[in-house]
């Protein structure tokens, strides 16, 4: 995730497509700094370590209020709704013009990693999380991504992985339609830039952080990358828009599909173990070891598995 973000962050928010170089030299020159999605994940991870696999939504909100200071996009509107004693899903909908932005998508892959091989459980976690500050496509795209992250522990075929994620959300929702259109367009044209153009023509909005566009660009990057880590994250960066999020998500999914040994040698050798939390994290240590975080995530995955999956019908 961090390696993907390192490619996408310099061009994040640029709405023109461009050819982006691959391996970022910055990986070996300084500790990785987390973006907003990883900031949330660091806080969610700490909260889940304390509360266990059956963590309540109220406990996530409490951790947010104590440790997250993000004040842009959807976040201040959700905070204001917490202050009005509005629980989810109302907190994600009421007076929130960014309810379908990509904030929950940017953090959703964590839920797949703590529910490995159990996409329905990952979807359950992701839905509860996303509804805190989103609704509609902002929730559905997050569920799709979480389901793919979970399935990627066992499913290595990119097309089938995308379909497994789609099976967790309504087939007629905008996120699902956009992803299926991308699959079809890419199959017809086999060109990432042509497919990107068609996606933006059909689904783009004024908000560069739109979750539907983000889902479509993630799907496009996976398809165009054909299982190659560098090609996939470079495609996401070349597409622009919300490339900080889309490159990070694409990097996560390819990392799960390929495993550490399947990543390019030059990327693995350059990546540093240190992760520095972004400015939005407050009241927690700003420095972390990527290896320790991975171990903690794996341990939570074991706890979730032992606790038993939440029946899909409860959604």
Question: Where do the model's predicted regions map?
Answer:
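Structured, active/binding-site neighborhoods that engage oxygen-rich ligands
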Residues: 1-315
